[in-house]
């Protein structure tokens, strides 16, 4: 056994070092992207909660269907749109449908923070598709971007990725 692919659990590195000391530990690309997807989902849920709170502060309508001349409720529309954006944010860009592309374009216009979180997730995902030398540079650039992004879920993710940087790069090599 020359390589061991695993997630970032600390106990795995201890067992591998103990049982197979010459093996190279590699971070499974799926799990690293899963960390980014979980961080993105935290940002999406917080954006939805913020939009829902704004929607609750809008004036209430009466019973029944709204009148044709009723004022629009933009915060309610925003909350509903963010709530229904989960799959568009999770999928790989090459697998998106036309409606999901439109949803991402809408997110880019209405919630820049959520869109930035999506771009961070996709940036980390693309690192695994690069040649090793390019991946080293791209990972360092991504770490800098994630540390400075002012999105708590991604600054926390940046600390985890930095901790497992060598293991992640072993998977690319």
Identify the residue ranges that each predicted region occupies.
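Conserved beta-strand segments of alpha/beta enzyme cores
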Residues: 24-26
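Acidic/histidine-rich catalytic cores and adjacent linkers
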Residues: 2-21, 30-33, 53-173
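Short alpha-helix plus adjacent loop in nuclease-associated cores
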Residues: 29-53
């Amino acid at each position: 056994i020359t390589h061991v692919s695993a997630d970032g659990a600390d106990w795995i590195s201890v067992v591998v070092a103990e049982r197979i000391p010459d093996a190279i530990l590699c971070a499974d690309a799926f799990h690293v992207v899963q960390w980014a997807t979980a961080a993105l989902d935290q940002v999406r849920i917080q954006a939805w909660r913020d939009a829902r709170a704004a929607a609750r502060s809008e004036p209430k309508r009466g019973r029944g269907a709204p009148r044709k001349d009723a004022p629009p409720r933009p915060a309610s529309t925003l909350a509903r749109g963010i709530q229904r954006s989960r799959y568009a944010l999770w999928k790989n860009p090459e697998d998106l449908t036309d409606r999901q592309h439109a949803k991402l374009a809408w997110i880019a216009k209405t919630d820049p923070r959520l869109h930035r979180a999506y771009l961070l997730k996709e940036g980390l995902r693309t690192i695994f598709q690069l040649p090793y030398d390019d991946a080293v540079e791209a990972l360092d650039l991504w770490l800098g971007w994630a540390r400075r992004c002012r999105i708590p879920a991604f600054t926390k993710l940046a600390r985890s990725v930095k901790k497992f940087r060598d293991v992640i790069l072993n998977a690319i090599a």
